[in-house]
């Protein structure tokens, strides 16, 4: 497949990039600063572009089969839902009709009507980013764009680790293991993202990945 990836220089985006290239996909990485992307590969094309400025990358989109966005803006989290809106519009205009968005875990439910972010112990430092991702999810759900989006929430804890290739796929509820922990490695999260892109089996849905 031909895939355009936004956010390839981020910690998680770079793992997703490696997974896509290792599967033999042709990847166009749209990054603000190409010098920050150390990956080199025959299947990789790097394009300088800013999600906030569609004209900087719109010309590279036609002909791609799918797109993946792994974005964050800790300096101004309010940019995140705006990025979702722009990408939905720009990708659909370019004829890219499959789109995976790396979301957050804060909107997952721990009980009916109770979200992860509603827990009194939810860290204050993460709240702005979590709220921004909740707003992004609302953008996707309200969108009328002709694009098969999938909003993919990680487990509550996601960190570098082993690529096991085995994990669970859920929906609106936070997935926890027998000990009550919600975890996944970045490597296995990337596996799940590429699985969804290849299969296209979660169109217009939010899903979550965890052990």
Where are these predicted regions, by residue range?
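NAD(P)H-binding glycine-rich loop region in Rossmannoid oxidoreductase-like domains
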Residues: 4, 35-93, 201
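Conserved beta-loop-beta element that borders a ligand/cofactor-binding pocket
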Residues: 138-159
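Catalytic loop of short-chain dehydrogenase/reductase
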Residues: 101-133, 141, 152
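A conserved pocket-lining segment of Rossmann-fold NAD(P)-dependent short-chain dehydrogenase/reductase
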Residues: 168-184
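Conserved catalytic-site region of short-chain dehydrogenase/reductase
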Residues: 76, 106-111, 157-161
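N-terminal Rossmann NAD(P)H-binding glycine-rich loop of SDR-like oxidoreductase domains
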Residues: 3-23
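Core catalytic loop region at the nicotinamide-binding pocket of NAD(P)H-dependent oxidoreductases
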Residues: 199-211
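Substrate-positioning beta->alpha
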Residues: 132, 180-194, 205
């Amino acid at each position: 497949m031909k895939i355009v990836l936004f956010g390839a220089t981020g910690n998680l985006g770079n793992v997703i990039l490696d997974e896509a290239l290792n599967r033999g996909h042709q990847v166009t990485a749209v990054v603000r600063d190409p010098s920050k992307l150390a990956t080199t590969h025959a299947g990789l094309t790097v394009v300088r572009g800013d999600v906030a400025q569609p004209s900087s990358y719109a010309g590279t989109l036609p002909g791609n089969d799918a797109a993946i966005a792994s974005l964050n803006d800790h300096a101004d989290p309010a940019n995140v839902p705006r990025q979702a809106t722009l990408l939905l519009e720009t990708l659909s205009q370019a004829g890219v009709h499959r789109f995976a968005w790396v979301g957050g875990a804060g909107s997952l439910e721990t009980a009916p009507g109770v979200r992860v972010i509603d827990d009194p112990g939810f860290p204050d430092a993460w709240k702005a980013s979590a709220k921004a991702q909740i707003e992004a999810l609302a953008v996707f759900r309200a969108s009328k764009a002709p694009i098969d989006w999938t909003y993919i929430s990680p487990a509550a804890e996601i960190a570098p680790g082993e690529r096991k290739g085995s994990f669970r796929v859920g929906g609106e509820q936070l997935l926890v293991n027998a000990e009550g922990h919600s975890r996944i490695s970045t490597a296995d999260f990337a596996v799940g993202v590429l699985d969804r892109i290849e299969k296209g089996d979660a169109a217009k849905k939010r899903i979550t990945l965890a052990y």
